[in-house]
Amino acid sequence: VSVLPAEMPTWEQTLRVTTADETHALAAALGAELQAGDLLVLTGELGAGKTTFTQGLGEGLGVRAGIISPTFVLVRIHPNLPDGPRPGGPDLVHVDAYRLGSASEIDDIDLENTLDSSVTVVEWGRGRVEHLSESRLEVDLHRAIGLEPIGLAGAAEAAAREPNPAHTEILDFDTEDLDEPRTIVLRGFGPRWSTKPALGGAFEGTP
C-alpha cells in the first residue's frame, strides 16, 4: 500500500566527522532516538561509511551485533536483544536496494510486513522507497576524497548520480572504513521528523 510521501524536508542538518569511530558514535546517538516505524534512506558512494553508520545505528537500537551490507541477500533482520540497552525495542531491518530498479521491486520484498514494528534502513533507497511512509529520514554520507558534500539543492543531482544496477557491476563491500573526514547530511521529511533528533554531546554543536 502506497502513501503520499513528503516531497520537501522540514529541516536539514550538516555534520562533520573525522574518523570511522566518530561516524559510528554519531549513528549510535541517532539510533538511540529511533522508534518502530522509522524509515531511513541511506546514500553514499563507495567507502563513504554506510556500513559503519548502520552498525552504529544498531548499537544505539540495541540489536544483535554483526551488521554487514546485505548486498547479496537484499534484506537482513537484526533482532532486538532482550538483555541489551533497549530491551523490547524495535528490530533493525537493513536493506540494500542497489539491485532493485524501481519502487515496484521494493514492494516485491514485502517491507510493509515489518515496517511498522521495526526500524528500516535502506541503502540506495532514494527514488525507490519514499512511497512506503509519509515520513522518512534521509542520511547522505560524503567522503572528503570523492564527491563534494551537497546541500538540499543538490539532492536531486545526487540521486541522478547513483549507479544503475543495469549498467554497472560495482559492488559496495563497505566493511572497513578509513579514518578520513566525512560530511553527513540529515534531512527530515514528514510529521515524524518535524524536528531534528537530539544527538547530544559534541554533535549538537557541529555546524
Language model: regions and residue ranges:
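Phosphate-binding P-loop
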Residues: 31-37
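P-loop (Walker A) phosphate-binding loop of NTP-binding proteins
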Residues: 45
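Conserved nucleotide-sensing/catalytic segment adjacent to the nucleotide-binding pocket
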Residues: 66-71, 76-126
